[in-house]
Amino acid sequence: MALPWVEKYRPKSFADVVDQEEAKYVLASWICARFRAPKDFCTRWAKKKDKEILDARAVLLAGPPGVGKTTLIHALAREIGYELIELNASDVRTAERLKEVVGRGLREGSLFGYGGKIVLFDEVDGLHVKEDAGGLEAIIEIIENSKVPIVMTANNPYDPRFRPLRDISLVVNLKRLSEEEVVEVLRRICTSEGAKCEEEALRSIAKSSLGDLRAAINDLQMYLSGGRKTLTVDDIKRVGERNPQLSMFEILDRVYRARWFDEARAISFNPSFDWEQYFIWATETIPVVYKEIETMSVAYDRLSKADMFIGRIKRTQEWELLPYALELALGGVSQIKSKPRLPPFIKYGFPQRLLILAKSREARKRRDVLVEYLAQNLHVSRSYVKSEIIYVLGVLAKSDSKIVERLSKALGINAIDIKTLL
Ligand SMILES: Nc1ncnc2c1ncn2[C@@H]1O[C@H](COP(=O)(O)OP(=O)(O)OP(=O)(O)O)[C@@H](O)[C@H]1O
């Protein structure tokens, strides 16, 4: 399998990490003030003198997904020649295990002549404070006693549960990448892959990535998969049209993985977002993603409330209510208190409802013709035909086959089909 481009083009040095200059200055100033680091690096990057930065015991990089938090730490370790001890909070479920792993990492000598060690707790907000017995306290204890740099990353460290961690660390916010920067990185990748990519096409990918460079690079790789060497705006449109289920998979994935309410809600601004389709897909994918009955029930409750808004909108045409419905259906389904940690890959199936509807499309068309014919000739509404007449005709047709024949002649639909419709 080809190397994912997010790995292939992961920045190796501090300078290669784009659009995060402020964070780089803060991080470098902290490292250079408190630990041993190469002079060249410090001269170039350690530009901050604030006491708060120089005195910090640990650094917590906060920001949305795919903006370079983890990459920045990897680049830092490489720049200063330190060995990186990387721990994912969810891998380390208990205080004992956490201390053991960090302790072992710090005790063992480095084989490759590193200048020191740096500990990275990736995604600390993935810690379930209740379940991960003592995990948070253990991290704080490690920070308090550590002689090596400790850095953490989090999408959302502003949950009150993480207050103690924020208090003891310097929180450095990384921003969403600008559209310009995303386009620039995509352009460079196109050149290096020998592909001709239209500026407009890259801009369109950048726009829908919402500042998440990882998502943008993944999209570009998908568009250029199979060795394709050109990318035009039309290609992007065509892929969207030909594979609506593909973009719906992406939409669902973004909704379920969104860390913040706003992030989930923003998906409705995406040009490919079709809320009617989304409702169908969400209905069938909630139990695929949320296995626990409680979480599942909260998600369904919110989706059903959104559906009540939709029902009202359809009845009264009060379209100004749509944003409320979408907030419930996107933010509400995505942000659930007991939300579990999601696996890296979720297999969202194609909704059965759509498959059944597609299979029965012809039969439904014939049924509509029949209903329309009866409604017009009997001077009644279509819903009356559906709820009453069809049933009565069905019973009559069983005892008198002429009824079916006459309907068949009048409608030009063969008699067997009429029988199955009644
Ligand atoms: N600022 C950046 N400069 C250059 N490349 C970046 C930047 N941000 C992200 N990338 C690209 O996106 C990929 C993912 O970035 P990274 O893992 O650092 O994101 P993250 O912010 O840690 O996200 P998450 O919170 O989901 O872990 C990188 O491998 C890199 O290719």
UniProtKB/Swiss-Prot annotation:
**Annotated binding of ATP, by residue:** G63, P64, P65, G66, V67, G68, K69, T70
**A GO MF term:** ATP binding
Q: Mind listing the GO biological process terms from this record? A: DNA replication
Q: Would the keyword Plastid turn up in this protein's UniProt record?
A: no
A Pfam family found in this protein is RCF1-5-like_lid
Q: Which UniProt keywords apply?
A: ATP-binding, DNA replication, Nucleotide-binding
Question: SMART domains of this UniProt entry?
Answer: AAA (SM00382)
What does the function comment of this entry state? Part of the RFC clamp loader complex which loads the PCNA sliding clamp onto DNA.
The subunit structure is:
Heteromultimer composed of small subunits (RfcS) and large subunits (RfcL).
The text of the family note is:
Belongs to the activator 1 small subunits family. RfcL subfamily.
PANTHER family assigned to the protein according to its UniProt record, in alphabetical order? CHROMOSOME TRANSMISSION FIDELITY FACTOR 18 (PTHR23389), REPLICATION FACTOR C SUBUNIT 1 (PTHR23389:SF6)
Q: Kindly provide the name given to this protein in its UniProt entry.
A: Replication factor C large subunit
Q: Which source organism does the UniProt entry give? A: Pyrobaculum arsenaticum (strain DSM 13514 / JCM 11321 / PZ6)
